[in-house]
């Protein structure tokens, strides 16, 4: 979107917000004595740390005065969803709340969707990153995307340079070819230095998200909206051999933990992948942009860098997985009009830029993503955000268990890979049916 288009969209949003605030009574024009007009108090819940965002959320918008107050409350990620359910049941929930994609469908009944008459599909798509398209439902927009936390490839610079490897791999094929150089074994055959943590579930951080990323790289959306609700696409398409593309993906994932394969680099006896990387014994770690400072704090002496995730050779698309943090409005808000106005103002470039700086992860608008920061880490994060996608996971905890069983059953040969996928698909289908009502 060029500068002129950006200005037009900003003007449109400004007039929309102005109308919302006048209608709600936040901007009380021509009726100073009317005490029944909405107070403009807006309560926001989210898991973003208060130390980095509270002041910004509460004080950065025009009109933040005694008649218009915003309060941000940080919630524990482990209890956030349950707290939302209990609060809404008592009519004590927030007016606005911030969700990652794996919480949207579970909370769909609480969300007020922004109608396309207020913010058209075209304007939404021209304003926000491609991956935000999952927020566009048939009957409106779930909410406004604020930040994206993309998956990236962290790599140990010393381990690569020791083997004469100048650049990190750009494709999975290139990664395969490096296993002979980067995997080191003891005399008894145990792995002392690993190339990458793939092929297991229990000790691979973000295993479900990595599998999701591989699916997205194959251009499979995982879940899509239909006329009857949301449907699973795990088994969409067939290969020349008659199997699902997802079967090939799972087999690819498992090769890294198969001792009979040249790519063997990981097994269940090894430490957690994050711990292995920060101890200097893992060449590549697939993690989130938000893990950067944690890596630095655990091992300040670790010589590492970051780049985009390897892609599938021959595909005409580039994808990584990302957590898109979205601010949504509650159907039960007693101050819905004001809440919607506040949420839309949080899409202003100045606000999103500062929020991105505070959190050290990328914003979601095309205009801001096109202006990469000078910091090399953040520049890679912005590159990754541009290709970042996600899916509307109907139940994060349930699907995590289902994916774990799928991988564990395949490794133990309790089920073939195809059978394990069939079982997982059926289980997720049942969850989606409940979600669809």
State where each predicted segment sits.
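Mature extracytoplasmic/periplasmic domains
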Residues: 34-36, 51, 290-294, 325-398, ...
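Glycine-centered hinge/linker elements that transmit conformational signals in sensory
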Residues: 178-180, 225-267
């Amino acid at each position: 979107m060029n500068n002129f288009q950006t200005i037009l969209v900003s003007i449109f949003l400004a007039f929309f917000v102005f109308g919302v605030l006048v209608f709600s009574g936040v901007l009380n024009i021509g009726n100073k004595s009317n005490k029944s007009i909405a107070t403009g108090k807006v309560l926001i819940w989210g898991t973003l740390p208060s130390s980095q965002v509270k002041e910004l959320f509460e004080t950065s918008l025009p009109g933040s005065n005694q008649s218009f107050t915003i309060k941000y409350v940080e919630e524990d990620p482990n209890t956030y969803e349950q707290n939302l359910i209990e609060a809404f049941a008592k009519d004590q929930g927030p007016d606005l709340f911030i969700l990652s994609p794996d919480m949207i469908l579970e909370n769909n009944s609480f969300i007020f969707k922004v109608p396309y008459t207020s913010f058209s599909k075209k304007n939404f798509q021209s304003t926000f990153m491609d991956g935000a398209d999952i927020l566009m439902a048939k009957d409106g927009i779930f909410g406004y995307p604020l930040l994206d936390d993309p998956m990236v490839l962290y790599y140990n610079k010393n381990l690569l340079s020791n083997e004469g490897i100048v650049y990190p791999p750009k494709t999975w094929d290139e990664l395969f070819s490096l296993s002979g150089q980067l995997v080191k074994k003891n005399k008894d055959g145990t792995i002392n230095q690993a190339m990458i943590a793939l092929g297991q579930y229990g000790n691979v951080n973000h295993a479900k998200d990595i599998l999701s990323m591989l699916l997205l790289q194959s251009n499979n959306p995982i879940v899509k909206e239909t006329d009857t609700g949301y449907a699973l696409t795990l088994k969409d398409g067939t290969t020349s051999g008659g199997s699902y593309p997802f079967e090939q993906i799972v087999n690819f994932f498992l090769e890294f933990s198969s001792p009979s394969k040249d790519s063997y680099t990981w097994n269940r006896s090894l430490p957690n992948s994050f711990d292995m990387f920060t101890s200097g014994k893992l060449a590549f770690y697939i993690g989130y942009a938000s893990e950067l400072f944690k890596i630095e704090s655990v091992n300040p002496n670790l010589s590492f860098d970051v780049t985009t995730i390897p892609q599938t050779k021959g595909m005409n698309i580039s994808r990584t997985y990302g957590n898109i943090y979205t601010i949504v409005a509650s159907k039960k808000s007693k101050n819905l009009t004001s809440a919607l106005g506040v949420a839309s103002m949080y899409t202003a470039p100045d606000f999103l830029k500062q929020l991105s700086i505070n959190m050290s992860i990328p914003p979601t608008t095309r205009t801001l993503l096109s202006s990469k920061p000078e910091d090399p880490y953040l520049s890679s994060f912005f590159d990754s955000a541009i290709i970042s996608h996600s899916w509307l996971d109907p139940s994060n905890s349930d699907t995590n268990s289902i994916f774990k069983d799928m991988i564990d059953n395949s490794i133990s040969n309790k089920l073939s890979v195809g059978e394990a996928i069939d079982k997982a698909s059926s289980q997720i289908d049942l969850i989606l049916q409940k979600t669809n009502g």
